[in-house]
Amino acid sequence: MKAGLVIVDRDGVINFDSDAYIKSVSEWVAIPGSLEAIARLSRADYRVVVATNQSGIARGLYDMEMLNRIHQKMAKALGEQGGRIDAIFFCPHGPDDNCDCRKPKPGLLHEIKDRLKVELAGVPLVGDSLLDLECAEAVGALPILVRT
């Protein structure tokens, strides 16, 4: 039986963020300690799920194939530490697209709830920005801020 669920943002939590976006595999660089922390959660039988805004897709900076390659690099790096990501949920829209899935709107978290058939009340959501915290609060999740 799984111990629980932890939702994490990607950029700025697992890997270093960039104002120029993470557009390629080479630009994805893990933050020291992040992979080990996720591996500890995995070994404790937590499901770890990523919820991330990826507006670089809408902006034409990278495509789905590149995003998948970046996520494959992340999964491989996590596997080498004994960790795993159980699912990745992302919003590909830009800030002016008025979608429901771009954080701080809670659509991405509702998708996690529906697809994984879980309740989100009290579930930790680890993020590095006010957007993440507001998103967590909108669904009753437990917002956890990391300063990287």
Which role does the model predict for each range below?
Residues 1-49:
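Active-site neighborhood of HAD-like aspartate-dependent phosphohydrolases
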Residues 25-29, 62-69, 103-104:
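Alpha-helix N-cap and loop-to-helix initiation/capping positions
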Residues 34, 38-74, 84-97, 136:
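Substrate-recognition element of Asp-dependent hydrolases with the DxDx(T/V) motif
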Residues 74-79, 113:
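Conserved hydrophobic residues forming the short capping helix/wall of the S-adenosyl-L-methionine
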Residues 78-84, 117:
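Short helix-capping segments at alpha-helix termini
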Residues 100-133:
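Conserved Lys-Pro-Asp/Glu-containing loop-to-beta segment of HAD-superfamily phosphomonoesterases
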Residues 125-148:
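Acidic, Mg2+-coordinating phosphoryl-transfer loop and its flanking beta/alpha structural elements
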